Amino acid sequence: QVEAEWLLIKDSPSTITLEELKRTSSYFTPPTYEDLPSDESTLQSLRSQNKAFSNWVQRNVRPHKMNGYAIVTLSLKKTGVPPGDATADQIDFVADLADRYSFGELRVTHEQNLVLADVKQSELLALWEELKAHGLATPNIGLLTDIICCPGGDFCSLANAKSIPIAQAIDRKSTRLNSSH
């Protein structure tokens, strides 16, 4: 059935031409990166001095294609808050962080988290400290508590069930299990 559908649409007006692809791609230019050395030894030193920072780096920071930069995922899964939920003040704060740390770019993921895609490794500690002060440094990316949850009956008029209480119960149970080990 997929192949039949493809034959119907492959040359239709909705197919993007190479010219249109080039035109739209021109709006997505990479930032002007600095030529930075990879700063792994300094980062490792900072991690060895601060267990909470180290845990956050391990869970929320990923390698970047450019030396000296990192990709940072901001978890919107703090215990006690509906998964993926953020206040207007938090979004304003994160937008300011994006301006200061990530070329003004902030991404929203399908996992209900936020990403600062171009953070200098040398600024990770300062970024973490700001996130921590605003309750946005939850180190749980990829863990059970990084729950993707439909807002369900709590926020959606189309829903026929509430899913947030279930997600919060899983989070509480997992948090208790983690704290006992």
Role assignments for model-derived ranges:
Residues 1-180:
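Peripheral terminal and linker regions in Fe-S/redox and tRNA-modifying enzymes
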